[in-house]
From Swiss-Prot:
InterPro entries: Gar2_RRM2, Nucleotide-bd_a/b_plait_sf, RBD_domain_sf, RNA-binding_reg, RRM_dom. It is found in: Nucleus, Nucleolus. Belongs to the RRM GAR family. This is Protein gar2. CDD domains: RRM2_gar2. Residues 90-120, 164-182, 202-218 have a biased composition (Low complexity).
Length: 500
């Protein structure tokens, strides 16, 4: 009965294997299986890679690439089949336990045969694995997915056959059946691990191919995808760097000082005690001072209560104006503000004045009249201003006899007329902060300085009516004092008109 059960089990196992698409293995002789395995190994080593590629490419073209979901479903089906094969092996091992008491001679023969079959199967699996590694290294990542599926199916079928053979041939003892089952479990674990690794590598390679769009069929798809991803990242960096370089602002250059910026500060609400030197000392802390002047009244000689401070740079002038509202001089809070800048070309000022007052140039002479002079101007200021025009013979600045202050004009005498003409061309030049009016001076006429014959005598005492008035009028008083009828009344002459 036991033998009948064994034969029925073998038939059922073979039927299940044929239904699932497994390859039926002849069990007549074990030597035939060894020779067949060797022939398969030789044929696989002799075959070239190119026909495999062509077959696989044809398969790939005919059948679409399996998706990840289909691969997972196949894994689940594989696990189910493996579990069913294990259950069959366990049932066969239990049957072998019941039949272990038949004969010891058959057990020894079955031991040798089982060991030979297990060794032959292990050799076949090693050969298949080496071939798979070679194929995976030489073939592209896209074709590796379809190959792995086929190899996985072949392995499962081989395992089923080995499990069925071991179950049919392990009728010797319990220990042998346990060893075969443990070996089959270990092999299944190894195969599962290798399949998982291959699936992970194939998935990563397919991802890299989709990102890099490479059509190469080499096995180093990962390295190619890495290189392409690096090149793409470098291109992106370059693209980002190009607009950044274009958007870079140009180097900031310091703005040149505008010629219209003023360096003069107006100072208001000054005390009458403040003079030029005092005013300059009060503003030395803000920058280099070129000049300082307090505006004075020409008649009284007293300060008008304001002045000007000239700095070397506009920045110093702005710093001084920033102290407005906090600056005190001689106990008084002063007002500070920027003065109107001097025009670079003073000619418009001279032309405007000439249009307003009808100024006309006099006949050329060697003496130049300088009008609109500041009361603070000195002979040195005029010498510095007009020294470049020619050789200066003399400089005169008339003063008031009562106050001793300047009258606001002067005279500059040159050695020749050409130098004087050059000086007049500087009409509107600033001296001590004021634009000067330049003209040729007319020469003096004689006979009028002391009033002619009327001079210092006559009944008018000290020149009579002609007196000092004649001197100032350039002879007008002298002409009047020279009247032959000195002090007498002129006789009446004319027609007498009466009205009736």
């Amino acid at each position: 009965m036991a033998k009948k059960d064994k034969t029925s089990v073998k038939k059922s196992v073979k039927e299940t294997a044929s239904k699932k698409g497994a390859i039926e293995k002849p069990s007549k002789s074990k030597k035939i299986t060894k020779e067949a395995a060797k022939e398969i190994a030789k044929q696989s080593s002799k075959t070239d890679v190119s026909p495999k590629k062509s077959k696989k490419e044809a398969k790939r073209a005919s059948s679409p690439e399996p998706s990840k979901k289909s691969v997972k479903k196949q894994k689940k089906s594989k696990k189910k089949e493996e579990s069913s094969s294990e259950s069959e092996s366990e049932s066969s091992s239990s049957e072998s336990e019941s039949s272990s008491s038949e004969s010891e001679s058959s057990s020894s023969e079955s031991e040798s045969s089982s060991s030979e079959s297990s060794s032959s199967e292990s050799e076949e699996e090693v050969i298949v694995k080496t071939e798979e590694k070679k194929e995976s290294s030489s073939e592209s990542s896209s074709s590796s997915e379809s190959e792995e599926e086929e190899e996985a199916v072949v392995k499962i079928e081989e395992k089923k056959e080995s499990s069925s053979d071991s179950s049919s041939e392990s009728s010797s003892s319990e220990s042998e059946s346990e060893s075969s089952s443990s070996e089959s479990e270990e092999e299944e674990e190894v195969v599962e691990k290798t399949e998982e690794k291959k699936e992970g590598s194939s998935e990563s390679s397919s991802d890299s191919e989709s990102s890099s769009d490479s059509s190469s069929e080499s096995g180093d798809s990962d390295s190619s995808s890495d290189s392409e991803s690096e090149s793409s990242s470098e291109d992106e960096k370059k693209r980002k760097a190009e607009p950044a370089s274009e958007e870079r602002p140009a180097k900031i250059t310091k703005p040149s000082q505008d010629s219209n910026e003023t360096c003069t500060v107006f100072v208001g609400r000054l005390s009458w005690n403040v003079d030029d030197q005092w005013l300059g000392q009060e503003f030395e802390e803000y920058g280099t001072i070129v000049g300082a002047r307090v505006i004075m009244d020409g008649q009284s000689g007293r300060s008008k209560g304001y002045g000007y401070v000239d700095f070397e740079t506009p920045e110093a002038a702005k710093a001084a104006v920033a102290a407005n509202g906090t600056k005190e001089i001689d106990g008084r809070m002063v007002n500070l503000d920027l003065s109107n800048p001097r025009p670079a070309n003073p000619q418009p000022y001279a032309q405007q004045r000439a249009g307003n007052f009808g100024d006309q140039l006099s006949e050329p002479s060697d003496t130049v009249f300088v009008g609109n002079l500041s009361f603070n101007a000195t002979e040195d200021d005029l010498s510095t201003a007009f020294g470049g025009c020619g050789d200066i013979q003399s400089i005169r600045l008339p003063t008031d006899p009562q106050s001793g202050r300047l009258k606001g004009f002067g005279y500059v005498t040159f050695s020749d007329i050409d130098s004087a003409k050059k000086c007049v061309e500087m009409n509107g030049h600033f001296i001590a902060g004021r634009p000067c009016r330049l003209d040729f001076s007319t020469p003096r006429t004689g006979g009028g300085s002391r009033g002619g014959r009327g001079g210092f005598g006559g009944r008018g005492g000290f020149g009579g009516r002609g007196g000092f008035g004649g001197g100032r009028g350039r002879g007008r008083g002298g002409a009047r004092s020279g009247n032959p009828n000195r002090g007498s009344v002129a006789p009446f002459s004319g027609n007498k008109v009466t009205f009736d």
